[in-house]
């Protein structure tokens, strides 16, 4: 569960696939106020080489993608329902594309004792189109559950897509509402991705600084990925 109950601002930075390249990264900025939220993600694919038909490098370019998001949520009886809208833009040197995708979901507390349930349908709508080629959206149905026990929180999430599914599970430990230790495991059989994750959040005054880490050797593209997040309660 989110550590913030109030309006907040957050910034995340990730160097992506560092086992393969050293200049691919993304930045994520999020602002939540009341029932509304806005966010933006900038993805930098790193410097690429442009070559001619003989393989001779002519120039370099840097493809970029951005996702601009808006969310709205409201409480209906004891449940929370939400809507998510995202504008996707791609600038891939010689090709540009835009898309508009949506997501709807609900949070259902205490469906069985202290078990909370989240259900969401994500990434459906209008896929980005590059010339005459239309990309395919990763539309998914996500079902997640969380269960608290004393200072512990246990969670799991199943993501069902058109051709495959992924699953993640984990636990977190709350130490005096100032330090949270986290550990999890992710499974994607189709893409042969299975790895453990670890995280640590530290709260001071209105700030929460978080760091997460994907463990893996050099055969795992996402291995040794570190995400740093800074949250500010407003």
Where are these regions (language model features)?
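Subset of outer-membrane beta-barrel
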Residues: 1-234
């Amino acid at each position: 569960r989110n550590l913030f109950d109030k309006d907040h601002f957050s910034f995340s930075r990730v160097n992506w696939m560092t086992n393969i390249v050293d200049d691919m990264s993304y930045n994520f900025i999020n602002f939540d106020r009341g029932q509304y939220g806005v966010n933006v993600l900038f993805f930098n694919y790193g410097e690429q080489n442009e070559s001619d038909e003989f393989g001779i490098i002519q120039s370099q370019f840097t493809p970029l993608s951005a996702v601009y998001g808006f969310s709205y949520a409201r409480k209906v009886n004891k449940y929370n329902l939400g809507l998510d809208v995202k504008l996707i833009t791609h600038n891939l040197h010689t090709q540009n594309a835009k898309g508009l995708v949506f997501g709807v979901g609900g949070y259902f507390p205490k469906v069985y004792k202290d078990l909370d349930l989240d259900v969401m349908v994500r990434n459906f709508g209008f896929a980005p189109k590059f010339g005459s080629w239309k990309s395919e959206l990763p539309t998914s149905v996500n079902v997640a559950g969380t269960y608290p026990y004393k200072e512990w929180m246990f969670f799991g999430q199943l993501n069902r897509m058109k051709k495959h599914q992924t699953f993640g599970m984990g636990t977190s430990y709350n130490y005096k509402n100032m330090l949270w230790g986290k550990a999890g495991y992710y499974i994607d059989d189709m893409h042969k991705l299975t790895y453990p994750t670890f995280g640590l959040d530290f709260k001071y005054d209105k700030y929460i600084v978080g760091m997460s880490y994907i463990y893996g050797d050099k055969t795992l593209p996402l291995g040794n990925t570190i995400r740093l997040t800074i949250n500010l309660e407003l």
